[in-house]
Amino acid sequence: MNSKFIVIEGLEGAGKTTTRDTVVAVLRAQGINDIVFTREPGGTPLAEKLRDLIKQGIDGEVLTDKAEVLMLYAARVQLVENVIKPALARGSWVVGDRHDLSSQAYQGGGRGIDSQLMASLRDTVLGEFRPDLTLYLDLPPAVGLARARARGELDRIEQESLAFFERTRARYLELAASDASIKTIDASQPIEQVSASISQALAQWLTNQEPV
């Protein structure tokens, strides 16, 4: 089977780390052991610097919405061109913690940046490059935020209002409904059921992939 790019998406507290473990277990059960992990923003030296700026800000300066989204795309293209595409080209599978869908949901939905501008940015920066499969972990924002707060100190984006995350979730659901490559998982279930749902969705998807 040719290498694939699988992305895990969702709001804060949705359980992306646990999902990654489940995805890896399913892939390895299929004999897929050459797996590269990525996170966004981040994943290259420059992208990690941008991650710090996006997550923490700098010296109290107000970070405008457009500056934020441009930094996200700068970090993303560095990761795609320097890590993800080379990994796929050499036959590795890539499992990513967030990708472009996050920007479409958080900046397009949460921040309210024009959807045409967001689509134009995506197409200009990434061209036709897209994940092969996206697992979107859906849960009520209040539940996710409670989980995030229980982990400790919140970053700049995690401190946004509940209304911001409601708008973000709404955009996630809107985009997932119109894209067959996005599988929505109910992440409000007990962790065992979430893992079972992920395993089932991924296993079914794998059976539909062309062998090498």
UniProtKB/Swiss-Prot annotation:
Keyword Disulfide bond listed: no
InterPro entries, A to Z: P-loop_NTPase, Thymidylate_kin-like_dom, Thymidylate_kin_CS, Thymidylate_kinase
One Pfam family per UniProt: Thymidylate_kin
Binding residues for ATP: G10, L11, E12, G13, A14, G15, K16, T17
GO molecular function, one term: dTMP kinase activity
Gene Ontology terms: cellular component: cytoplasm; cytosol
Listed GO biological process terms: dTDP biosynthetic process; dTTP biosynthetic process; dUDP biosynthetic process
Keyword terms: ATP-binding, Kinase, Nucleotide biosynthesis, Nucleotide-binding, Transferase
Gene3D superfamilies cross-referenced by the UniProt entry: P-loop containing nucleotide triphosphate hydrolases
Catalytic activity: dTMP + ATP = dTDP + ADP
PROSITE patterns xref list: THYMIDYLATE_KINASE
Xref: PANTHER family: THYMIDYLATE KINASE, UMP-CMP KINASE 2, MITOCHONDRIAL
Its job: Phosphorylation of dTMP to form dTDP in both de novo and salvage pathways of dTTP synthesis. 5-bromo-2'deoxyuridine monophosphate is also a good phosphate acceptor.
Subunit structure: Homodimer.
Family indicated by similarity: Belongs to the thymidylate kinase family.
Record protein name field: Thymidylate kinase
